[in-house]
Amino acid sequence: MSVLTRKTFIEGASAFALTFGRRMFAAPSGWIPPKKPNLVFGVLADTHLRISRDGGYDGRNWPDKYLVSALEYFRSQNVDAVVHCGNMADRGVIDEMRFHADAMRRVFKDDRSTDGRKVVKLFINGNHDVEGGGYGAGFRLEQIWPDPDERKKHLLSSDMAGNWLRIWGEPHEAVWHREVKGYHFFGCDWGRDETAFAEMIDANRGTCRLDEGTKPFFFITHDITHDAFNKFIGGCPNAFGLFGHWHQSAANWNTIHMLNETTPSIQCPALYPLFGDGKWLGGGDKYISKAPLEGKLQGGQWRQGLVVRLYDDLLVIERREFGEGGSLGLDWVMPLGKRDPHPFSNDELKKVIGEPQFRKGAKLEVVEEASASPCLRVRIPLADGNPDSRVYAYEVVVIGETGSKKLFKAVYAAGCNMGIGHEPNKGVTTLEIPKAELPPGESLTVAVRPLTSLGTSGRPIITDFKV
């Protein structure tokens, strides 16, 4: 098979080739696809709703309004199902999962959409759900219920089957299989044997025709799956994974993983509030520039989720921010049946992520700050000149006198983890460089180029500055 270029990737699927006269990799705001999808489902992970010190609901930092906002968006998109990749509860407390169920019932009354369709719950437990009683930031459960026997009564894990039935109104299964509109889903709780999970999928391969045609089936876990399971799933050509736990922002394209270079598995972003790129960088950001990324707080405090749409020949993933709202960028589009090379492999993604660009006439603002901690302050305008490629970070190069060593810096783009149009300070990014780090010379040249999360780059803007 010939190499899939950016042009053929965009134009290869008839449903998305040309719309309103514009060539597309994904749908811009307000764009309506020419065909109704076969299946639509929302995806959440790591909600981490939590109790307060008095055992009630702690809505100060983890308000359920963002969960409700996500679910309401799913409802507006006519989802057929909602996936949760685990960690609905923060400390494994029964009421924490009940908070989640209450929000679901407010939005999907009787588990139905506004048109009366059944909305299927595809939920698994994460580590906080099954063993969260031992976790706790700020306070521990021992401070609320000092007596171990009393404390146990409040934990999901004390009777997961009974608690799940009482909360969700359906039996709990640690490993399960569901069918939604002809598409198959398999789920596995945290801590369960992945061998048993593989055996369940394998037992359904023939009866469910999982390997026939190009229709994908989905396996849902809390953490990314491990070697033995990955070896098995690599033999299932239509498999597609969804997992949480890592708390990475979906603005980062490194959250698309390939298991054994054959099976796509998407890390689903957390819905509870995070700054920067979350806790688990996975090494992806370390290699997109010649310097480590700084300024993660500028990326914004985000709460995210996904919407997946299935067509006959395409799988499309929409990435949303639910704190302030908005899209995180162009959809991820996977033509079905293309495997050599796989369209979600890193090399192929680099061909379609594009190159972010500054607008024509964009200028840097460089100011020397003479304070107790003297520095060079560089203000970078938002690189939104290419609507088909969103900026994730900037690489800054400072050049001094001839023969001196160049200084390399890198910084997250302001609001890179927020919805488009919700970047703080109009997307202007500030980088402060300590004066002691600057190369020698009375005149410095400062060059800044925009980067994507995969390291592709646009044209730099350059300015000279006299120290």
Predicted regions, residues:
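Conserved aromatic anchor
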Residues: 376-388
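Extended active-site neighborhood of metal-dependent phosphoesterases/phosphodiesterases
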Residues: 33, 93-206, 210, 234, ...
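Binuclear metal-dependent phosphoesterase catalytic core
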Residues: 253-357
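Solvent-exposed loop/turn segments flanking beta-strands in beta-repeat/beta-sandwich domains
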Residues: 385-401, 405-407
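Extracellular fibronectin type III
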Residues: 455-467
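N-terminal export signals
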Residues: 2-3, 7-28
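Beta-strand-rich modules
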Residues: 438-454
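N-terminal active-site segment of His-dependent metallophosphoesterases
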Residues: 27-97
